[in-house]
Amino acid sequence: MKILNLENENRKFTKSIENFHVMEYLQDSSVSPMTAMEEYYMSKMNVRRRQVVIELDKEHSAIIQSGAMQWMGGHVQATAGIKGIGDLFGKAIKGAMTKESAVKPEYVGDGYLVLEPTYKYIILVDVEKWGSSGMTIEDGIFLACDGRVKNKLTARKSISSAVLGGEGFFNLSLVGRGAVALESNVPEDELIEVELENDELKIDGNLAVCWSSNLDFTVERSTGTLVGSAVSGEGLVNVYRGTGRVLMSPVAPTDSLLTATNTTQANPTVKNNLPLEN
């Protein structure tokens, strides 16, 4: 199969890792007179539609989030990736615990697989560069991965990290070789990468997008005592200890696009400084 105009003056590939490519629409031309101005300024502020384009062959298959496929071309087939009732039950539990779809279809064959467009920012990651333990990701940001990448659950190191942090007991971990596509609420160039070497990182809130799976992740008080936490104005913080990497978003939480794109919600301190209405 040959696609003649996948790239043109308005559609460009902005990043590629192996057979995974991010296609970005420089501007949304399919607008009405009522939305033209809004779409114009959105494109100027880098709020654009993006899609993942995956090339499939005998060496590369792809696992995607359920419902993410837009179209596929060539001799491509979708499989459920389920190996019996027990496997289905296990995947259902995994999905419920990680806010991901219970069954992620795997596409195999020879051709192209194109995912649904999104206004979120797509981050491509080479899992192998995260070491033998792989990477753990924040709930709900998985979009797709190479078929060679294994998906597994990683339990929190302590019950406190789930109960006190208001999060689940498990996160999705990815390990192996190949590319992974993640949906981020902020662009990749705004993310901060922190390398730890027998060190620790404390973050106020769920700002971490992904981290090395071998890091110890707990939730603790920001200071040694309850009084100290009260005086400092900070409560609980996420703590990452050990040797590894953390990719974090300093400008917006990772939990929702609305929160990420709303200045008042993205920075809780703003609402305390807003002028009172008469």
Report residues per predicted region.
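Composition-driven recognition of glycine/serine/threonine/acidic- and proline-rich low-complexity segments
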Residues: 1-278
